[in-house]
């Protein structure tokens, strides 16, 4: 991942203010995107910027680095449009959005809206969530937030009722992108899964530090869930039936993630322990396991 986020300094153009771009990290922190907001800037054929950042050298020590970068726009040739009848209107090009609201919603899941470009403004009154009560669709309150990591994404949170039926709807023109496009109307219905479809995992842990967390893993070691160890116990609810691995991290600095330490400062990497068995359970089961992390398998 990037050690620091490069800050671009204009060389051959002068922005009207400091808010001339949106910043978006991508590829799990390995890349960064800059979305230009000023048309006087992004309409130029060539942009030159100076970027300063910290870069790890061959000894893995961070050193200041400054580069000059030039971006050249390659214009696509204008396509010839087919002749249309005088009374035939041009089709409207809408702001594209990928909405995550699956027809079978997990009880712990939430709705996401990921736009093709950052949003300049939106009308919160044009966003609706309705629940089917008996036979009547009833509006319910919800939380709608800008994602903290992806500048193009917004999240809708609600405490779903297991087995409940819902409808997510957005009026047309509710969202306007930074390049002038607006969204079409959206309507998606879905049903929340029942509690009986899930299982739970409870780990009774000994031998760990006072601050630690446990991660549940799939068969590729991908992290599926992360929970803190509280009073010697890590609890995972609403899991899909199947097989899981687990690992514990002694969270020395309490920041909720594994840290590699600092060689120059003599700080050791945080200790990691892997559970020596596969955790397997069926639907509507509770799997309770005792785990002494320092015990020899």
Predicted regions and their residues:
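N-terminal targeting or signal-anchor segments and their processing/structural boundaries
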Residues: 1-297
